[in-house]
Amino acid sequence: MKVALGLVLGLVVGGVTLRLLLPTLAAPVLQRTNHRGAPIATAAGLVVVLAVLGAEAALGVVEAAGFDPLGGAVGRRLVVLATVGFGLLGFIDDLLGAGESGGFRGHLGALAHGRLTSGGVKLFGGAALALAGLLFGCAAAA
């Protein structure tokens, strides 16, 4: 039941967030041309970040009223940490990335040649977030 409630809440908040953000995602600064020449929104991950924050805010209000519909506050905090952290790293990559090195292999290749790309920052930042989440989760479980 908790999984179904979480899924429904996430879908509703995500759908509303997407509808609200569609005009923003169409802004030229957030558009790139893909390999087929079609324009794509680069910062679509913002929808996920804002949906998670919105759902978490709604759950916070419900919990403040004395209900605990989902439980597992530590796990939810880790999800928020990972989502916001990866979302921020992705947004920085979208805004600052020059498109010179694409994909995991391209960013590692650039690093091997002494260049740190915005995707490389995302790579190392993601690893740091994963480690922080692991340490936080282990400390909370103890």
Q: Model-found features: residue ranges?
A:
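"…together with the soluble PPM/PP2C metallo-phosphatase catalytic core" -> "…together
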Residues: 1-142
